[in-house]
From Swiss-Prot:
Protein name as annotated: OTU domain-containing protein 5
Quaternary structure, from the entry: Interacts with TRAF3.
Gene of this entry: Otud5
Listed EC numbers: 3.4.19.12
Keyword Disulfide bond: no
Organism: Rattus norvegicus
Catalytic reaction(s) noted: Thiol-dependent hydrolysis of ester, thioester, amide, peptide and isopeptide bonds formed by the C-terminal Gly of ubiquitin (a 76-residue protein attached to proteins as an intracellular targeting signal)
Amino acid sequence: MTILPKKKPPPPDADPANEPPPPGPLPPAPRRGGGVGVGGGGTGVGGGERDRDSGVVGARPRASPPPQGPLPGPPGALHRWALAVPPGAVAGPRPQQASPPPCGGPGGPGGGPGDALGATTAGVGAAGVVVGVGGPVGVGGCCSGPGHSKRRRQAPGVGAVGGASPEREEVGAGYNSEDEYEAAAARIEAMDPATVEQQEHWFEKALRDKKGFIIKQMKEDGACLFRAVADQVYGDQDMHEVVRKHCMDYLMKNADYFSNYVTEDFTTYINRKRKNNCHGNHIEMQAMAEMYNRPVEVYQYSTEPINTFHGIHQNEDEPIRVSYHRNIHYNSVVNPNKATIGVGLGLPSFKPGFAEQSLMKNAIKTSEESWIEQQMLEDKKRATDWEATNEAIEEQVARESYLQWLRDQEKQARQVRGPSQPRKASATCSSATAAASSGLEEWTSRSPRQRSSASSPEHPELHAELGIKPPSPGTVLALAKPPSPCAPGTSSQFSAGADRATSPLVSLYPALECRALIQQMSPSAFGLNDWDDDEILASVLAVSQQEYLDSMKKNKVHRDPPPDKS
C-alpha cells in the first residue's frame, strides 16, 4: 500500500479548481485525444523517484523515426522513445517523437543523464513538477528543431495526475514548441558571435572535405525549411510557397495520423503553418518525406545526419539534405556531383541529370563534327597545295628537259654537219630554240613559217629567178613544232633543195611523246608571259629568211660557171 504525504494547505489566493485530488485511488484519466499522462517520474523526465508499478509504451503505426512496436524492458522503465506512465493513467496511441540533443551539449542545457527527450526539462525535475497533464505530449512547433519533443509549460509546484481542468489545460498548451524557440533565442543571444562564426566555418569545411557537400544559404525569413526543401526538389528556393501548400494539404489529408503529434487544435496548427513566415519542424519534415518519397536527412554541426525521416516506400533516390544552424535556421545541403532536382515529383521515366548529360553529349558531338570538318578542309588545302607544287615541279622538269634536249640536238647537228655550214645550222637551231621557248599555246595554228608566207612574202622575184620552190606549209608546220629541226641527219638532207622540202622529218625525232607534253603546257611554264609573241616570231622569221637567201645565193654561184670573156 502506498502512503501518500499529507495534503498541504492551499495558499489564500489559490484556485480550488487547480488543487490536486484528495488521497486515495487515482481515477482513470479521460481519453482526450489519446494523450499520455506523465507523472512525476525519475531522473529522465520529472526528477523524482520513478513509479515502478506499471508502464505502457505507445507505438508508431507507420514509417517514422520512432521504432515499430512496443519497446522491450521491465515495466516502468524509461526508454528513448517512451515515457513511464503512472498508475491509473491511460496510454493512447500517440508516442513521443525522437529528440537529438542540441548543439549545446549531449543532453541539452540542463538535461540529466536520462533526459533524452529534449532540452527544456532543466530545473523541472528538481521542482518535482508533473509534466503532461491528461493530454497529449506535444511534438514540434512553429520554430522547433529537427526532432525535439516538448512538454507543456506550467507553473512550478502545480500539477494534476489525471483530471485537470480544461481551462488550465488550454492555458498551459500554447504553441506546439514555443518554449524551445524562446530558449533557442536566449541561447543565441548568450553565445559569442566569434564562436558561432568559427563553428559555422568548421561545419561547412567538414561537410565539404569529408562528404563533398556544399551548404547553400537560404533566406532567413521563417520559411527557411521550406526554402531548403524547394531548393532540393525544384532547384529554386523561391518555390517554398508551393512546397508549404503541398505539405499542409498532405497534413490535412492525413490528419487522423499527424494530429496525434500536435498538442493544440490541429486545424489551428495547420492554419498557422500556412503562413509564409511561420517556421517548420520535424512534423513537416516527416510529411514531406512521405509526400516526395525521399528521406530527409538533417545535419547539425556533424558530418553524419543527426536525424533521418523516411518515407513510406523504400527506394534508391537521393535524400533531401538540410542543415540546422543555431537551433533556429535551416539551409540546403547540395551534392554537386549528383543531380537531385526533380526527384519525387512523380514524373514518369524521369532521370536526374539526364537532360544535362544529353545536352553535353550533343555539344560534344557537334564539336567533334565541326572539328572533323575543319580538319577535312585543312587536309584539302594541304592536298591542293601539294598538287599545285607537284604540277609546278613537273612543268619545271619538263621545261628543263626540253631545253636540254634542244641543246643536245644542236650539238649533234654541229658534229654531223661539220664546219661547212656552221652559221646556217646555228641559226636554224637558234631559231628553233626561240620558237620552242616562246610558249605558244597552239602549235598547229600559229606557225611562224605560215605567218611569214601569208603576211610578208619577201623577194618573190628572187624565188622565180632561182627556180626554187619555197618550203611548203606542211613542211614548215612540221619544222615549227617541237622537236627542233636541228636533229641529226646527213648533209645531203640539208642540200637537197626540193627533196628536203618533201622528205618526212618526223623520223628524225625519236622522242615524239615530248611534243605532246609540250603542246599541253601553258606559256607560263617557260616564263615567257611577259614577252610579246609577235616580236619574237618576227625576229626569228627575219633571221631565218636572211639565212635562207644567203644559202640560195651561194648555191647558185657554185652551180653556174663564170662566163667566157673570150
